[in-house]
Regions:
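N-terminal periplasmic/intermembrane-space "pro-region" immediately following the signal or transit peptide
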Residues: 2-3, 24-86
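Outer-membrane beta-barrel architecture
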Residues: 74-75, 115-119, 155-159, 195-199, ...
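Outer-membrane beta-barrel channels and translocator barrels
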Residues: 80, 121-127, 161-165, 203-207, ...
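Surface-exposed strand-loop-strand hairpins of Gram-negative outer-membrane beta-barrel proteins
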Residues: 82, 92-119, 142-144
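Transmembrane beta-strands of outer-membrane beta-barrel proteins
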Residues: 85-89, 128-132, 168-172, 194, ...
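Transmembrane beta-strands of outer-membrane beta-barrel pores
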Residues: 91-99, 122, 134-140, 174-180, ...
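Residues that define the transmembrane beta-barrel architecture of outer-membrane proteins
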Residues: 108-114, 148-154, 188-194, 226-232, ...
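Outer-membrane beta-barrel "beta-signal"
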Residues: 277-278, 284, 288, 304-318
């Protein structure tokens, strides 16, 4: 990988907080499990998003349609070699200090996170792009096997790059998310949302860049009712090319989550640092360390968690 062009990374990772508190009944246990599933999906999606960092080559890449889940953007100089189709995959092994994301510490565990999917971002006209994305995520826990689950995302939308404002990108997209048990024969959660957002890249040199962004996820429909939320998030990402093959990433996200059918209100933070060793433009080895904090007006759903792990990633563009 070379540094012939500046590159910018925005980390779209957010840690969603989860669902309203209730007495300790079987139904409440279901709420707790669903809450943690949704939060883990977005937390690990944000962390592993740093893994999709191989240099895509010359050409402008708008905010990737996979970005809402994978957390990457590439911004280079436009030319005719822009590749609109991306295939991506990641397999990572993590240790988490609080697997169930419970108040008071919780139990640690190892888990495997697997992600694979495809994104198509065709240029429609000028600086207007379309996008269609499919993403499958699988989470498998070593000891707490009852926490294992699958996540499927399907969505699409439009992206517009305002060159006159320093390549400020604005976008709108629809997303459908479905969580199931590991055998995919029972639904845990689903939600349909519209995401509106913008992001502004800053290039300091060929080796250093940053991005600021804002996302608003607006609920259209979802189930179970207690798990449905809107989300408003501020994001900041930084990338440094340490060598020709080694890159460092930092990101921070602050999210406000008002739940639709309950009085629950959460403030969520995630801070993550990662390293990527790019073996080739298509394949990389990654490691990360992250801390997440959730502050809720329902004390039961306040928690903190530390995650560390490593994995391998592939990103192919056509």
């Amino acid at each position: 990988m070379t540094h012939s062009h500046p590159r910018k990374t925005v980390i779209y990772g957010l840690l969603y907080a989860a669902i309203c508190a209730a007495p300790a009944t079987a139904q409440t246990r279901s709420e707790i499990t669903t809450d943690a599933d949704v939060a883990r999906r977005d937390m690990i999606g944000a962390i592993t998003g740093q893994a999709f960092a191989p240099e895509p080559g010359p050409g402008y890449a708008p905010p990737s349609p996979a970005d809402p889940d994978l957390g990457e953007q590439r911004l280079l100089i436009p030319d005719q070699r822009y590749k609109s189709l991306s295939l991506f995959a990641n397999v990572s092994e993590f240790y988490t200090s609080n697997a169930a994301l419970t108040n008071g510490g919780g139990q640690g565990d190892w888990f495997t996170a697997m992600q694979f999917g495809a994104s198509w971002v065709p240029r429609i006209a000028g600086s207007l792009y379309g996008e269609v994305t499919a993403l499958q995520q699988l989470y498998r826990y070593a000891d707490l096997t009852g926490l294992s689950f699958n996540s499927l995302d399907l969505g699409g939308g439009l992206i517009y790059v305002i060159r006159e404002l320093g390549d400020l990108s604005v976008f709108a997209r629809y997303n459908y998310n479905l969580l199931t048990n590991p055998t995919a024969d029972s639904s845990i959660f689903y939600q349909q949302t519209i995401r509106l957002g913008l992001q502004k890249p800053f290039v300091f040199s060929r080796a250093h860049s940053a991005t600021l962004g804002f996302n608003a996820d607006l609920n259209l429909d979802g189930w179970p009712d207690y798990a449905v939320r809107n989300r408003f998030a501020l994001l900041a990402g930084y990338q440094a090319n340490l060598t020709r093959q080694l890159q460092a990433n930092l990101f921070y996200a602050l999210s406000y989550l008002p739940f639709v059918d309950t009085s629950r209100r959460d403030w969520n933070q995630i801070l993550s640092a990662g390293l990527a060793w790019n073996l080739t433009p298509q394949f990389s080895i990654n490691a990360s360390l992250s801390a997440s904090f959730n502050d809720s007006n329902e004390n039961f759903f306040q928690y903190s968690v530390l995650n560390t792990g490593a994995g391998v990633s592939a990103l192919l563009r056509f």
